[in-house]
């Protein structure tokens, strides 16, 4: 594959993956090469070759930026070659046209023109052709790289200071909707209040949240709006938990009070029954003593009546048993 001598077409682009297939083909200067007939392995090899050529090719824009910054900076691509471009085994041998038809849901035979198939599938709405699709969109939709891995935030090594003589600088990231990617519950005001200290080397945050390159010690800590937003979000939940806990404590106290009252009433009932039984026992013992005394008196009275007044004369006397 032959590249243009000056490489200006590629150097003017911020990323090769933002080029469409037609632009990429014209930038390479190989109009006779048909990307649709290539398989996915050949397409990736061409992209990687163009990446290496773009990194080596001198560009006027890069030279002027290097003069302002102080040293040359290597262009950071939104899709990393080593970690994210991994072809599945079933996809590596497919041609670009076959993959594009699978993406668009056209199906059809291999000899069918992709543009004609797209026009026949949706006559009311014009479908984009393969040449109008960017490389990044094609790779993401084909499943070569996940969409979240394709999104990369680049922090430049220097940014304009907000206050002279301080290391607090204006954020270099452009937030489209005022929200930080991957951070939930951060208001636009909190995102605008963020400040980032300038690192000595570029710091790249890829889509997986991994920090690549640079010195992390120069980054300033997260400011207070994050904590405020999280506290506001967690407030109602904490209040509900406390309210449920208080209601549970009140119910437990009421249940314990009812249990103590039932126990006390049962004890008092038992004590009353014991006292009543004691009184009955005392009365029965008294009646028993009276009955025994009455029986004894009746027995003595009968004996007296049978013996009469001579009963006292009967007594034992000693008889003479010795020799006369």
UniProtKB/Swiss-Prot annotation:
<dbReference type="InterPro" id="IPR004827">
    <property type="entry name" value="bZIP"/>
</dbReference>
<keyword id="KW-0346">Stress response</keyword>
<comment type="function">
    <text>Transcription factor involved in abscisic acid (ABA) signaling pathway. Transcription factor activity is fully activated by ABA. Acts as a positive regulator of the expression of abiotic stress-responsive genes through an ABA-dependent signaling pathway. Acts as a positive regulator of ABA signaling and drought stress tolerance. Plays an important role in ABA and auxin responses. Involved in ABA signaling and stress responses by directly binding to the ABA-responsive element (ABRE)-containing genes, especially WRKY family genes. Modulates response to auxin.</text>
</comment>
<keyword id="KW-0805">Transcription regulation</keyword>
<protein>
    <recommendedName>
        <fullName>bZIP transcription factor 46</fullName>
    </recommendedName>
</protein>
<dbReference type="GO" id="GO:0009651">
    <property type="term" value="P:response to salt stress"/>
</dbReference>
<dbReference type="GO" id="GO:0009738">
    <property type="term" value="P:abscisic acid-activated signaling pathway"/>
</dbReference>
<feature type="region of interest" description="Disordered">
    <location>
        <begin position="106"/>
        <end position="127"/>
    </location>
</feature>
<keyword id="KW-0539">Nucleus</keyword>
<feature type="compositionally biased region" description="Low complexity">
    <location>
        <begin position="115"/>
        <end position="124"/>
    </location>
</feature>
<keyword id="KW-0804">Transcription</keyword>
<dbReference type="GO" id="GO:0043565">
    <property type="term" value="F:sequence-specific DNA binding"/>
</dbReference>
<keyword id="KW-0238">DNA-binding</keyword>
<dbReference type="InterPro" id="IPR043452">
    <property type="entry name" value="BZIP46-like"/>
</dbReference>
<dbReference type="Pfam" id="PF00170">
    <property type="entry name" value="bZIP_1"/>
</dbReference>
<dbReference type="GO" id="GO:0003700">
    <property type="term" value="F:DNA-binding transcription factor activity"/>
</dbReference>
<dbReference type="InterPro" id="IPR046347">
    <property type="entry name" value="bZIP_sf"/>
</dbReference>
<dbReference type="GO" id="GO:0006355">
    <property type="term" value="P:regulation of DNA-templated transcription"/>
</dbReference>
<keyword id="KW-0938">Abscisic acid signaling pathway</keyword>
<feature type="domain" description="bZIP">
    <location>
        <begin position="242"/>
        <end position="287"/>
    </location>
</feature>
<dbReference type="GO" id="GO:0009789">
    <property type="term" value="P:positive regulation of abscisic acid-activated signaling pathway"/>
</dbReference>
<dbReference type="GO" id="GO:0045893">
    <property type="term" value="P:positive regulation of DNA-templated transcription"/>
</dbReference>
<dbReference type="GO" id="GO:0009414">
    <property type="term" value="P:response to water deprivation"/>
</dbReference>
<feature type="region of interest" description="Basic motif">
    <location>
        <begin position="244"/>
        <end position="263"/>
    </location>
</feature>
<feature type="region of interest" description="Leucine-zipper">
    <location>
        <begin position="270"/>
        <end position="284"/>
    </location>
</feature>
<dbReference type="GO" id="GO:0005634">
    <property type="term" value="C:nucleus"/>
</dbReference>
<comment type="subunit">
    <text>Interacts with MODD. Interacts with SAPK2, SAPK6 and SAPK9.</text>
</comment>
